[in-house]
Swiss-Prot record:
Protein name as catalogued: Protein 7.3
Family, per entry: Belongs to the T7likevirus protein 7.3 family.
Transmembrane segments: none
GO cellular component: virus tail
Region (Disordered) residue spans: 48-106
Native source organism of the sequence: Enterobacteria phage T3
Length: 106
């Protein structure tokens, strides 16, 4: 057990012991004040309110989305190879050339 953990436990124990009498005194004072103000017996009155009527939202409109045809000259093989190449690039794509001269490290 670390040194600070021991200190923390000791402080918690002392605070807990000091707090117990304060809680009891607070409860007793609260009861006395409540009785003096006529709050000895509390009555809870619940009124039932009618549930608010919520109108149903209008249905969503149907939107016609034109289908996009494949661009001319582009087939799946090219796009698949481009994806593989980009994935294989990895960290290489994040590096900055030394001759760029920007002076900003990424």
């Amino acid at each position: 057990m670390g040194f600070f953990k021991k200190i923390k436990k000791a402080v918690k124990k002392v605070v807990k012991e000091v707090g117990k009498p304060i809680e009891k005194a607070g409860k007793e004072v609260g009861k006395a004040v409540g009785g003096a103000l006529g709050a000895g017996k509390q009555e809870i009155i619940q009124q039932e309110a009618p549930a608010p009527v919520v109108a149903a939202p209008p249905p969503a409109q149907v939107v016609d989305v034109p289908e996009q045809d494949k661009a001319e000259g582009e087939d799946e093989a090219q796009t698949e190879s481009a994806r593989k190449k980009a994935r294989a690039g990895g960290k290489k794509a994040l590096s900055v050339a030394r001759s760029s001269g920007g002076g900003i490290n990424i």
